Design a protein with these regions (language model features):
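N-terminal pre-Walker A segment at the start of P-loop NTPase domains
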Residues: 2-35
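Short, amphipathic alpha-helical "recognition" segments used to contact nucleic acids or chromatin
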Residues: 28-31, 234-253
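Walker A/P-loop nucleotide-binding motif
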Residues: 33-52
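AAA+/P-loop NTPase substrate/partner-engagement loops
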Residues: 47, 59-90, 97-102
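A short beta-strand-to-loop transition that corresponds to the Sensor-1 phosphate-sensing loop
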Residues: 95, 124-131, 141-152, 171-173
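Conserved catalytic/switch belt of AAA+ P-loop NTPases
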Residues: 101-141
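A short helix-turn-beta junction within AAA+ P-loop NTPase domains corresponding to the substrate/partner-engaging
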Residues: 155-176
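Conserved AAA+ ATPase small/helical "lid" subdomain
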Residues: 181-234
Length: 275
């Protein structure tokens, strides 16, 4: 399979680009109802991929779910046991980036991700003898969702999986991420502060809001300055903007002195960036 580049991210040619949460929910709802049997969801960290999937499938961390939800740190034999216990139920494998790298995981994923309705999964080792009810092979009709931050073809087995999947590249704009965050984030001061800088933020993460909340609640008066350094890719711009927000600096002379101390750059650079 060839690949295309989307803002420096390598993607399979047949990836479907999804740019808003409403459209993402349409695909997730179809998966939840069983209409889509095999989906690979790609997207950068901090945009709510996992939360959206859990909401669509009714997965609640506080109670038992009918969906098998597996994170990347799971061991291969543990994955096999989970697939047996949840056979014929939906399966979500999160953090596929880790699972990719383990050949034992890939050997399980290859038959699991077969496009046939009934898929035969096997574990050919003595480990199953320690779990009396666990067979060495079984058949399941589970539909499967794989979640990853990036797409990588490490070997032929992985490429074989890609050829079978509906591949979604979730790429919401910073405005869309900000809008979605309003549905759950309950700190107006932080929310509106982030919103005032959206046009300058190249890549927004929902984690930025939570980090700012932790800094502010810990008593850091300069939490806004710290947040800008996290969000803005140009550190010089972040420093200049942060200096305007520093309550301990009351005039330009103090700000310029602090700017040159932090960056080693000149007074002229300070005014150029500020402009």
């Amino acid at each position: 399979m060839t690949a295309k580049t989307n803002n420096m991210i390598l993607l399979p040619d047949d990836a479907i680009v999804v740019t808003n949460y409403n459209d993402l929910d349409r695909y997730l709802d179809k998966f939840a109802e069983g209409s889509l049997d095999l989906v690979l969801l790609l997207g950068k960290p901090g945009i709510g991929k996992t939360e959206s999937v859990k909401q669509a499938l009714g997965i609640d961390d506080c109670r038992q779910s009918e969906t098998l939800y597996v994170e990347g740190h799971a061991q291969p034999f543990g994955l096999y046991q989970g697939l047996w216990r949840y056979r014929n139920n939906p399966v979500v494998l999160d953090d596929l980036d880790r699972l990719y790298a383990n050949p034992d995981h890939v050997r399980i994923l290859k038959p699991l991700c077969n496009t046939r309705r009934a898929k035969r999964i096997s574990w050919l080792s003595n480990a199953v003898t320690g779990v009396p009810e666990l067979p060495t092979e079984f058949t399941t009709t589970s539909n499967v969702m794989l979640i990853a931050n990036e797409w990588r073809s490490l070997n032929g087995n992985v490429r074989a999986l890609e050829d079978r999947m509906i591949i979604l590249w979730f790429k919401p704009t910073v405005e869309e991420i900000h809008r979605k965050t309003a549905e759950w984030f309950d700190e107006p001061e932080i929310y509106h502060f982030v919103g005032s800088y959206l046009s300058h933020i190249p890549q927004l993460s929902m984690r930025h809001y939570e980090r700012a909340k932790r800094l502010r609640n810990a008593g850091f008066l300069d939490w806004k300055k710290s947040l800008l350094q996290m969000m803005l890719s140009d550190r010089t711009v972040a420093v200049v903007v942060g200096l305007q927000l520093d309550p301990l600096l009351s005039n330009e002379t103090q700000r310029i002195k602090q700017f040159t101390a932090e960056t080693g750059l000149s007074r002229a650079t300070y005014f150029r960036v500020k402009a």
